[in-house]
From Swiss-Prot:
One of its GO terms (molecular function) is transmembrane transporter activity. SUPFAM superfamilies: MFS general substrate transporter. Disruption phenotype: Strongly diminishes the production of asperlin. It is a multi-pass membrane protein. Efflux pump; part of the gene cluster that mediates the biosynthesis of asperlin, a polyketide showing anti-inflammatory, antitumor and antibiotic activities. Is probably involved in the efflux of asperlin. This is Efflux pump alnA. The lineage of its organism: Eukaryota, Fungi, Dikarya, Ascomycota, Pezizomycotina. Residues 1-21 have a biased composition (Basic and acidic residues). Residues 1-36 are annotated as: Disordered. GO terms for cellular component: plasma membrane. Belongs to the major facilitator superfamily. TCR/Tet family. Induction: Expression is controlled by the asperlin biosynthesis cluster-specific transcription factor alnR. The chain crosses the membrane at residues 40-60, 85-105, 110-130, 136-156, 174-194, 202-222, 243-263, 270-290, 319-339, 355-375, 382-402, 413-433, 522-542. It is found in: Cell membrane.
Length: 553
């Protein structure tokens, strides 16, 4: 054997030995925890995440804070014909601008756009608190809705960048806890301010206090995240935004919501203006869909809606969108109508009627936190949609049977089932969608699931008010055929409650029964939403998504 062959053999043996040692070493090593993507830890991280969640809480709070304080607002500002807009203006503005905010956060510095959205929200809150007319209040609510949803999208952009894949379901569910808690605590907090010496204006001023408290955290602790390469000009960033789609979508929401909101309450359904508004809204939504699908005056990269996530071959994201809309419905309807039920049947004041939501709130918060934690630990997501949809369906069907004589216990128990079910998948879709897409598509997934939830909330509020007002007015009209419709609408809106109290006892009981029946009808929306959720699970897979995604990462 030559010296060269000897060297080669020794080298080969040495290499084999190294490989064997390396293999043994790797077998003995424990799997490493995923490296944290954030550079703040410990107490500073706790303070930072609390500050982030506080903005989500305030946004959710403003969704429903006017639910049971509208009579006090009307008493101060007048303008009964614009009553419903104190709530609808906020959710309409949020739904119409959520996709635009997503593009803004995808083009500009995330930290400073987040702070800008908070400033817009605080400005709108100041206008609402200082409002001297209903028009001023409605304008402030629109500004609040635009800024509030910007905060929400900002949080959904921060969390994926500051948490690991394994942590994410827990943090997203914790955000769901704050969002759900804010949504259902809105009537309680609003009622507390209204019934106290502070008055209803502090329902809006409180946002300024909380925002000011956490302002140093936003400015000094939040990391500066730049989504675009350094040196990218403002003009080039704006060119990557779909301004045409933004205008079409906002106009579609405005027309559709105006038509549905005013129909029956202010004008008959046959009114030409109502027909035109509803028709125009529908046409504009179709135009928006065509413009986005075929990239008219936009491109595949810059279009507003993430059409690429909608696929027949991989339907999971589309099913998550549907379930997101459904959970928005199941949270919104009880939040608005349970206080209304107790105001009419028990004569509750604003605060007391809001407190009646606590069983619903507690179960929603519990299931949201526990569901998010267990989904992250176990990896499966489909069981939470099945159980959540089932509980919502049972609870909603039982709430449909409520009568004036049912008593508080039945309402507490039945609504708790809805809270338990809706909490199970309230925020789960955000984590699932982000885990199913490539890293560069995470912002689009955020837009997709956030849009679903806000759309469900918006149309649940608009449609439930429409169903309640029209059903109650129709049934009371049968009982009191000689009363003007405007008087009846005022009474069922909460601004003319003395009208009901002054009726003879027998007639009063009939009217009360008609009102409760109208409230029951709103739960048809929840029944349908829960049933659709269960149907959607038929297209989902049993997969350990979060564990697999974390391993791949």
């Amino acid at each position: 054997m030559s010296s060269d062959d000897t060297v080669k053999q020794e080298h080969s043996c040495s290499a084999d030995s190294e490989k064997q040692d390396s293999s043994c070493a790797s077998d003995n090593e424990q799997p490493k925890e995923p490296q944290s993507p954030r550079n703040i830890h410990g107490l500073l991280w706790v303070v930072t995440i609390l500050a982030i969640y506080s903005s989500t809480f305030l946004f959710a709070l403003d969704n429903t804070i006017v639910a049971n304080i509208q009579p006090a607002i009307i008493s101060s500002l007048n303008g009964i014909e614009k009553l419903a807009w104190s709530g609808v203006a906020f959710v309409m503005a949020s739904s119409a601008t959520v996709l635009t905010w997503l593009q803004i956060f995808n083009q500009f510095n995330i930290k400073w756009m987040y702070i800008f959205s908070i400033a817009v929200f605080m400005g709108g809150s100041a206008i609402c608190g200082a409002a001297q007319s209903m028009d001023m209040l409605i304008g402030g609510r629109v500004i609040c809705g635009i800024g509030g949803v910007g905060q929400y999208v900002g949080v959904m952009n921060f969390l994926p960048r500051l948490t690991t894949m394994q942590e994410r379901p827990m943090y997203v569910s914790a955000m769901g806890l704050t969002w759900g808690a804010g949504t259902v605590l809105g009537p309680i907090i609003g009622g507390a301010f209204t019934d106290s010496s502070a008055g209803w204006r502090w329902s809006f001023y409180i946002n300024l206090v909380v925002g000011g408290l956490f302002a140093p955290v936003y400015i000094f602790l939040l990391p500066s995240l730049e989504p675009q390469p350094a040196g990218t000009t403002v003009s080039s960033r704006l060119k990557r935004m779909d301004l045409v789609g933004t205008l079409i979508l906002f106009a579609a929401f405005a027309a559709g919501v105006i038509g549905i909101n005013f129909a029956g309450a202010m004008y008959p359904w046959s009114e030409p203006g109502i027909i035109v508004a509803i028709t125009l809204g529908g046409v504009l939504f179709i135009v928006f869909g065509i413009q986005q699908t075929y990239c008219i005056l936009t491109t595949e990269e810059t279009r507003l809606f993430p059409v690429e996530l909608v696929s027949w071959r991989q339907p999971l994201l589309s099913l998550l969108f549907v379930c997101g809309c459904c959970t928005g419905v199941c949270v919104t309807v009880p939040t608005y109508v349970i206080p209304l039920y107790f105001q009419f049947t028990e004569g509750d004041e604003s605060l007391q009627s809001g407190v009646r939501l606590l069983p619903f709130v507690c179960l929603l918060v519990f299931s949201c936190v526990s569901g998010g934690y267990l989904a992250g630990r176990l990896g499966y997501y489909i069981p939470w949609y099945i159980m959540g949809g089932g509980f919502c369906l049972i609870g909603s069907a039982l709430m449909y049977t409520i009568k004036p004589s049912s008593g508080p216990g039945a309402t507490y128990g039945y609504s708790s089932l809805i809270g338990l079910g809706s909490g199970m998948y309230l925020q789960l879709g955000h984590a699932v969608a982000q885990a199913k897409v490539k890293p560069e598509k995470v912002p689009a997934a955020v837009a997709f699931t956030t849009t679903a939830q806000l759309n469900g909330l918006t149309f649940a509020l608009v449609l439930s008010q429409c169903v309640f007002v029209n059903e109650a007015a129709k049934r009371i009209g049968w009982i009191l055929p000689h009363e003007p419709r405007s008087t009846i609408v005022d009474a069922i809106s909460g601004t003319g409650s003395t009208f009901v109290q002054e009726l003879p006892t027998a007639t009063q009981n009939e009217v009360l029964g008609a009102i409760v029946t109208a409230i029951d009808r709103t739960y048809i929306l929840c029944i349908v939403a829960a049933a659709v959720t269960l149907l959607a699970t038929l297209g989902m897979k049993w997969e350990r998504l979060f564990i697999e995604a974390a391993a791949a990462a």
